[in-house]
Amino acid sequence: MFQDNPLLAQLKQQLHSQTPRAEGVVKATEKGFGFLEVDAQKSYFIPPPQMKKVMHGDRIIAVIHSEKERESAEPEELVEPFLTRFVGKVQGKNDRLAIVPDHPLLKDAIPCRAARGLNHEFKEGDWAVAEMRRHPLKGDRSFYAELTQYITFGDDHFVPWWVTLARHNLEKEAPDGVATEMLDEGLVREDLTALDFVTIDSASTEDMDDALFAKALPDGKLQLIVAIADPTAWIAEGSKLDKAAKIRAFTNYLPGFNIPMLPRELSDDLCSLRANEVRPVLACRMTLSADGTIEDNIEFFAATIESKAKLVYDQVSDWLENTGDWQPESEAIAEQVRLLAQICQRRGEWRHNHALVFKDRPDYRFILGEKGEVLDIVAEPRRIANRIVEEAMIAANICAARVLRDKLGFGIYNVHMGFDPANADALAALLKTHGLHVDAEEVLTLDGFCKLRRELDAQPTGFLDSRIRRFQSFAEISTEPGPHFGLGLEAYATWTSPIRKYGDMINHRLLKAVIKGETATRPQDEITVQMAERRRLNRMAERDVGDWLYARFLKDKAGTDTRFAAEIVDISRGGMRVRLVDNGAIAFIPAPFLHAVRDELVCSQENGTVQIKGETAYKVTDVIDVTIAEVRMETRSIIARPVA
């Protein structure tokens, strides 16, 4: 009777269109209920039965119900699922398998089965890659996943590495392939094998891609030749090895080991500038005036060199600081170290006066046992030898940026535009409240940015610096020359790490075209997109492995009185994030640990402060003492507590 009633259909349509709806992202809680977050201000309650239809992170459209002045959301339509491809731990066995996603807010096991053709018999505790196949909001009865890749067994000591690489879909090993002979590139190579080139690296480094030679000139000037390993002498553009390097884009450096961009035979041997081995290089000869200015007679050329010594950062630093018992093996090498230290001093002063110098942060190194256990984590401060290499590389990259810009008009450039113009007024207003007056227009120029950075560096603490960081734009990779505000330079193009950065290989090929006087093809913009994406994934992988190892390292400190100095790096509504000064671990201090009475506590991300009873008790960049309250291995999170 009512089946085809057009009035009824119209009424249903009307009711549907009049029912309020909202689109947002599902946020799960540990208590079974959840929230639909529409924006920063508005969220709706999702009752536990309705949460069964969705997953934390899903973007959905929901119907909004109002009962007794309480609004709740009923999920109706899936816009974008949170989980598509993911890693997790397998539960059950044989024909009844489920997988728990490796994510702090996803606790429920998802029924699953192995994909066809995947011949691994999954067991309880195995790690796997899975892909979602069913979702209740897509008309399916329940969630369902398919196991697409076996990662490793549950007790594997190297789980942090294998799981992280699988999560980000990154390669686990060096690329295959060999290069048997050098290409005929039509380059005339200068024979510099008689010169006392040296490399300075960590003791364990095998892929040495830069060697340095310095010479004093009669008029108080200094000459520097930077010689860089030459993988493009072996790898033709468009070849199989080139395509593999293009996809990887970078060598992936993880705690404990690296996954090279090039086959190890090339990265650690044929291209590596080993001591007492003749190697082809691409080189840059520059003259530095007394104040460290790079003069205009920059020269790029192909050469062969023979490094005369593999020097180690700490030994060189000790010797220059008159400590330790290491001595250069000859007076010629000693003279090189002295001259390179002079160049470092001059270039450091030039950058301090005319560009920007980063504050030195220590590097943290994990010392691992054979089974991946963390024996120690050591902070390695950046010392004089590190700065020698850094100044030489920055100078060489400035030279490449100039030559590529003037001769070709393109290359692979690192570009950083400073502050986002949309933030300029807010930035000026914030600085004004702290007594610094800047012009919103001027601060968007390179000179204005440098001026502000110098003022911030002169502040007694880094608090204000941390406040304005959110107004900065991100560094980008571009085929167009452009300024690098972060370094305070008009243009910056790297070519000094071609064994581990594909962009540097591209710049090598472009510089070789300049040397030969040939025309060159502008790199396609897609390559910069791939490089930016790979850089992001590699950084996330390094962070994820690090989090896992930090959790392992600090697990036995949980609940003890062991104190750690910790710098506050971020404050949010829920508490504070801190970095342990001695080892670099990130820990979280929940708000209740800061003060028991919630109403008397204000944690402000906006101001970077924690106020208790209206008084500022903590602020970002403060260093405080903490103990480790808890280490949660399943989420690799470290919970700390301030020492009262």
Swiss-Prot record:
Enzymatic class: hydrolase
Predominant subcellular localization, coarse grouping: cytoplasm
Enzymatic reactions: Exonucleolytic cleavage in the 3'- to 5'-direction to yield nucleoside 5'-phosphates
Keyword line: Cytoplasm, Exonuclease, Hydrolase, Nuclease, RNA-binding
GO molecular function: exoribonuclease II activity; RNA binding
Cell compartments where the protein resides: Cytoplasm
Domain RNB: 189-516
Physiological role: Involved in mRNA degradation. Hydrolyzes single-stranded polyribonucleotides processively in the 3' to 5' direction.
Similarity field: Belongs to the RNR ribonuclease family. RNase II subfamily.
HAMAP family: RNase_II (MF_01036)
UniProt protein name: Exoribonuclease 2
Species name: Escherichia coli O17:K52:H18 (strain UMN026 / ExPEC)
Gene that encodes it: rnb
